[in-house]
């Protein structure tokens, strides 16, 4: 299992534009082979700052999503005008357990 942590801040008044892109990608990502889940959190301390955590079956699944044409269009739009800053971390899960 692989986790992708995407931390980002949007430029002023660009959060709505980001969430429009998210809506365009929702159906696409759900049909992506190896996709497990995605969650997004807004910072209470820093305005227009978010963290998105997606879970994938394996590294190949993440690589395929990165190459997805619609995703690439959204990435480029984000880099050009939506994001003030961003950081992406990709990590392999070596342990996963819980009470459920």
Where are these regions (language model features)?
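Short S/T/G/P-rich N-terminal loop/turn motif that feeds into the first structured element of a domain
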Residues: 1-49, 57-67, 83-100
